[in-house]
Amino acid sequence: PQALAAWGSAIGSLPFTVGEWAYSESQRDGHTPIKPPVFILGHWRSGTTHLYNVMSEDDQWGIVTPFATGLPWEVMSLGRMFKPLLRKGLPEHRYIDNVPVEDDSPQEDEIALANMTDISFYHGLYFPKKFESFFNSGVFFEGLSGDDIERWQRVLNTLYLRLTLD
């Protein structure tokens, strides 16, 4: 039943994925270039979430919403359509630190990227025996070819483009 649900979800979302890809690609050339991102680096429990929340209050900074994190390929279509339903499904706060979660709370772009590409240290959480390999390739690009790195950059740029179009 779980495999059937996964296949059904993938097939059902395919028209939205393809449509959103076509739309975002058609906008890429005429779109104002996206400024280079600012990366917030820090150790867990060091205040990075607070800094991100403070910065997100200034309109010059963009954020990755919970919907973009969960539906990065369909954020403009399914994300909008299901926003009321998804809003009800959001937890009141993050379980690890009691920080409130709202539909416009900034989230880590790395989680969205993990949903979009195989190059992410987050995959090591699901495959702990390969954690070191996922970490090194996802953080340091260790062992990746130039083509792999270019593919990751394209996915990152696609995510940021969609966030500016949404």
Can you annotate each of these PLM segments?
Residues 1-29:
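A transmembrane-helix-recognition feature enriched in membrane-embedded lipid enzymes
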Residues 68-166:
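PAPS-dependent sulfation machinery
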Residues 40-59:
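Glycine-rich phosphate-binding P-loop
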Residues 5, 9, 38-41, 45, ...:
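Short, charged/polar micro-motifs that form catalytic or ligand-binding hotspots
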Residues 33-35, 45-46, 166:
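Short, well-ordered loop/turn elements at secondary-structure boundaries
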Residues 57-67:
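Post-Walker A helix-loop "phosphate-sensing" segment adjacent to the P-loop in P-loop NTPases
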